[in-house]
Amino acid sequence: NIVEFTTKANALNYDSMDALKKATDKPLIIINESMQFSAGVNLTYTMEFADKNDFKSIEKFIKYFQETCKHLKYSKHPVISAPSGLTLGGGFEVMVQSNFVASHTNIVVGLVETIVGLIPAGGGCKEMLARWLNTDEAKADPNYASLKVFDIIGYGKTATSPTEAEP
C-alpha cells in the first residue's frame, strides 16, 4: 500500500489517519514528493474546537492521532516513510514510527510544536529519545540523551538534512 497526504501543506486530519491505519493491512510506503511531506497536524482544525470550548473533541482527535502512530509502530507489516521537504510536528511523528526511513536530501525535520506553545503528542518524543540513547555519548552518560532531546524539542530545533537529523 502507498499513502500520500493531499491536504493543504499535507496537514494531518482524521482522513489522513484513517488512510494510514487502513493501509497497514499490507506493507506500507508513506511518501510525498511535494514541498511538504507533512507540515504536521492541522492546527486550524483543532483551533476550531478550542474556539467553541469543545476540548473533548480536541482530546479525541489527539488520542486518535496517538493510536494511529502506535498502529504504524507496531504494524505486522513493514512501514517505510520516504519524506522530502517539510516533515514537521505530526509529520515527523508519523515518519519516526516507520521501520525504515528513506529520506530525500532536501528535508527539514523536527518537532516544532513548542514554538507555538504545544507539546508533541504522537510518540515522536519517545522515538527521538530511543535513538539518542543508542549513541556512544549516551552509553557513557545516560543523562546525555535526555538533555539532548529536551534541548531539541524544547527549542523546536529542526534538522535540514538526513545526516543532520541522525543522533
What feature does the model see in each segment?
Residues 1-15:
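C-terminal accessory/binding modules appended to enzymatic or scaffolding proteins
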Residues 2-3, 17-56, 63-82, 104-108:
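A structural preference for short, pocket-lining loop segments at secondary-structure junctions
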Residues 8, 12, 57, 64:
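Conserved acidic
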Residues 8-11, 38-41, 157:
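Short, exposed beta-strand "edge-strand" segments with a Pro/Gly-rich flavor and a Y/T-containing core
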Residues 9-10, 36, 86, 118:
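Short strand->helix junction
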Residues 14-17, 40, 92, 122:
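Conserved strand-to-helix beginnings and helix N-cap segments that scaffold or border functional pockets
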